[in-house]
UniProtKB/Swiss-Prot annotation:
This is DNA translocase FtsK. Coiled coil: none annotated. Signal peptide: none annotated. ATP binds at residues 488-493. The chain crosses the membrane at residues 16-36, 64-84, 96-116, 130-150, 168-188. It comes from Chlamydia pneumoniae.
């Protein structure tokens, strides 16, 4: 009843259909246009096409609006066009005001700037004479507004702000109206446009400052004569002092400096003249070798332009410019992020509205299941969006966790991840894929790292977290890393990102890499890097030798630290050298120890294909090599218990898991399920020892073209010097010394002869070695005619007797 009364009190007026409104505006446009076009002030009203009504209507419009009245028919025609097309009219009032302000301002500006003689004949004949009496026709162009605002006595802009100020005001009003009608205001509000304007201004001012600095330096470096003289050259500009000429920066050194011929020397013949030394001599002396003063008159120096000639007394000789060295690039000049390509993807403006809509759906879903909760922060990363849910008191966290599939259904998400609770917060986190995913460009991470003061020892620029923050890690504190993921999940791209992080932030003298690539195509492009300890290892028989060499290097470094009384590599590199103590050591002690990083791709394939036990040196390095700066990065497609054994897992606290096949593999690699629900293409879970729980992030991407650019740039800056050209030599020397037998061969032989059991699993259990090494020992015992060949399910026959029994 109340609603009906309200409706009856305020009845709605009937509205005209759109076609009727369009026709009405079209009629007004034709009426005003024909009446204005046929108006003539010297002709009677009967000559007007619309008659007396049209003549009076035109006089009224021209009297009040001046020349701007001719835009009124266009305004009605624009309205008719909008109604005919049924175009939506947001902010119609403001657009109409902007449309009408254009002719109004233009008429006033025309009245101010146009003299009487240059008025168009069309306007001069159509403006009424009785408007302002004997005033010149230029006043009529603006109509009454021009007379009131500019020429009148009550409010005269001409005397208040002058003609320039008036033109400035109305000109800016016209510019603002044009921008508003064309959508320029919305363009100005966009962040991309603002950033572009900022960059343009910054680059402009930087260019100005650089040019100003060059000009100042040019003036400072201009050579000045030590003694002024009078030139006899008739073509010289002044008689008292020669005009200084700019000396080119290009120098061709042929030897010492010689005096000019006597015929060309102005002044006395008893005086000698020498060329002014190059103005950048102070800079050049940093990169030149000192040379003995053996200047003779026969040698000359050539400059690219004519230098200033100065006079010196006889007997005084100026030292010749020394010979230039090959300018070496400073070691601290590393490749910058400018080499890499930019990320051209722009985040759409509708992302925030879409996330708010998702948040509303999430809250409604929780309410429908009887969960009272509020929503906290909404964070958006490159591929993920994270919502914070603040449950009320009495709500069980496990109840929210059990609604994972229902929430994914309501949000129409391919997969979600619920963090119950968020570590350090009284909230539950829900991560869903963002509706507008973006790739994480490695250039952005490198640019942020190079612009910050935070410097890591072995930086790993991995990607961006779910909230959009950068994910950086220091391998020196991790201290080893395992990367697992199926084919196409982003594992190989992550390895490339890790290698690029190290080579673009550290010098070749600070870090050395040992890369093992059984696939022979993924990482072989890094062989020419100056950071490499050896070329990329692709043969499985070299892998064991490389790992054994790293173990020996680890033991050698520990011996040096023990001798010097130091605890780790950081103390060694920052020590004060005592050359007397270090010289008494039996081997040479270097000034610094570089970090060494071993990167092994496809660990599972190596464990199956290698005949030697590579698990033992890996475990030894993982247990002991941290203090001496040797670190390992392992990658595998199959994170099963046969590959990632208990000893490996215990010594690799830092792990990265991309999408895996099942929950069991996820449990093995990150100690919790969830990796099987990842989206792939760089979506990863990172487990760090310094952080409680896992971190979800999007891995960075770098293309092959950028990798090749960086490698070429590094090779041009630093020479490639391998410490070990190949590990084949180690294999040959070991085979010559040991007779191609395992060090445990004698122990395995004694054990088999004593027990009478010759099986691979028996040796693996008793000697505590891996399966591959135990199988290799069985093969060596068979070749030595100690045991017989395999006979299927039957045990092997022992061919010799135990010497103790005999």
């Amino acid at each position: 009843m109340i609603r009906e009364r309200k409706k009856s009190r305020h009845p709605r007026l009937p509205t005209l259909p759109l076609a009727a409104k369009a026709s009405l505006y079209l009629f007004f446009a034709c009426f005003s246009g024909l009446s204005l076009w046929s108006f003539h002030r010297d002709q009677p009203c009967t000559q007007n096409w619309i008659g007396l009504l049209g003549w009076s209507f035109s006089s009224f419009l021209l009297y009040f609006f001046g020349a701007a009245a001719f835009f009124i028919p266009l305004y009605f025609l624009w309205l008719s066009f909008l109604y005919f097309r049924r175009t939506p009219r947001p902010l119609f009032f403001y657009k109409a005001a902007a449309f009408l302000s254009l002719p109004f301002c233009s008429a006033i500006l025309l009245s101010m700037l146009s003299p009487v003689g240059t008025l168009p004949a069309l306007l001069d004949t159509r403006l009424p004479k009785f408007i302002l009496g004997n005033n010149p026709p230029v006043s009529y162009v603006g109509g009454i507004p021009f007379y009131l605002f500019y020429e009148g006595q009550s409010f005269c802009l001409k005397h208040l702000i002058g003609s320039v100020g008036t033109a400035l005001i109305f000109g800016f009003v016209m510019l603002f109206s044009v921008l508003y009608l064309c959508g320029g205001i919305a363009l100005l509000k966009k962040k991309t446009f603002q950033d572009g304007v900022k960059k343009a201004f910054c680059s402009f001012f930087q260019t100005c400052f650089k040019n100003l600095k060059k000009l100042i330096n040019r003036r400072n470096y201009l050579p000045k004569p030590s003694v002024p003289f009078v030139s006899k050259n008739p073509f010289s500009c002044t008689k008292s002092q020669p005009s200084p000429r700019r000396v080119s920066e290009t120098i061709i050194l042929d030897g010492s400096i010689s005096p000019l011929p006597q015929e060309e020397i102005p002044g006395s013949k008893k005086e000698s003249f020498f060329l002014t030394p190059h103005p950048c001599k102070r800079f050049l002396t940093k990169f030149v070798e000192p040379q003995e003063n053996k200047a003779k008159e026969g040698k000359t120096i050539a400059l690219s332009s004519t230098p200033t000639v100065v006079r010196e007394s006889k007997g005084k000789e100026r030292a010749a410019l020394p010979k230039l060295k090959s300018l070496a690039v400073p070691e601290n000049d590393l490749p910058q992020y400018h080499l890499l390509s930019k990320n051209r993807e722009a985040r759409p403006e509708s992302l925030q509205a879409e996330l708010e809509r998702k948040a509303l759906i999430l809250k409604q879903t929780l309410t429908s299941f009887g969960i009272d909760a509020d929503l906290g922060n909404i964070c958006s990363g490159p591929t993920l969006a994270a919502f914070e849910v603040l449950p009320h008191s009495g709500v069980k966290v496990q109840k929210i966790k059990s609604l994972e599939n229902d929430i994914a259904l309501k949000l129409q998400a391919s997969s979600i991840r619920i963090i119950a609770p968020i570590p350090g917060k009284a909230a539950v986190g829900i991560e869903i894929p963002t509706p507008f995913p973006q790739a994480v460009n490695f250039r952005d991470l490198l640019e942020d790292y190079q612009k910050t003061n935070r410097k890591l020892q072995i930086p790993l620029l991995l990607g961006k977290k779910a909230n959009g923050d950068n994910l950086w890690a220091d391998l020196a504190t991790m201290p080893h890393l395992i990367i697992a993921g199926t084919t196409g999940s982003g594992k190989s791209v992550c390895i490339n990102t890790i290698v690029m992080s190290m080579i673009m932030t550290t010098l070749p003298s600070e870090i050395k890499l040992v890369i093992i690539d059984p696939k022979k195509v993924e990482l072989t492009g890094y062989s020419q890097l100056p950071h490499m300890l050896s070329p990329v290892i692709t043969e499985s028989r070299e892998v064991y030798n490389a790992l054994v060499w790293l173990v020996k290097e680890m033991e050698s470094r520990y011996e040096i630290l023990r001798y010097l009384g130091l605890r780790n590599i950081q103390a060694f590199n920052s020590r004060t050298r005592n050359k007397t103590i270090e010289a008494s050591y039996d081997r040479e002690i270097r000034e610094t120890m570089p970090f060494m990083v071993g990167i092994i791709d496809e660990l599972s394939d190596l464990l199956l294909s290698s005949s030697q036990d590579i698990e033992t040196p890996i475990i030894r390095l993982a247990q002991m090599a941290r203090a001496v700066g040797i670190h390992l990065i392992l990658a595998t497609q199959r994170p099963s218990r046969e590959v990632i054994t208990g000893l490996i897992k215990a010594n690799f606290p830092s792990r990265i898991s991309f999408k895996v096949s099942n929950k069991v593999n996820s449990q093995i690699i990150i100690d919790e399920p969830g990796a099987e629900n990842l989206m792939g293409n760089g979506d990863m879970l990172v487990l760090l020892p310094s952080v409680f729980g896992t971190i979800r992030a999007q891995g960075a991407y770098i293309c092959d073209e950028d990798i090749n650019k960086v490698i070429q740039d590094l090779c041009s800056r630093f020479p490639t010097q391998y410490v070990i050209p190949s590990f084949h030599a180690f294999d040959d020397s070991d085979s010559d010394n040991s007779g191609e037998k395992d060090p445990l061969f004698a122990q395995a032989k004694t054990l088999i002869l004593q027990t009478g059991n010759a099986s691979t699993t028996f040796l693996q259990r008793k000697l505590k070695i891996g399966y591959a090494r135990a199988a290799s020992l069985i093969d060596q015992l068979e070749e030595a005619r100690i045991i017989g060949p395999s006979e299927g399910a039957k045990p092997r026959q022992i061919l010799i007797q135990n010497p103790l029994e005999g």
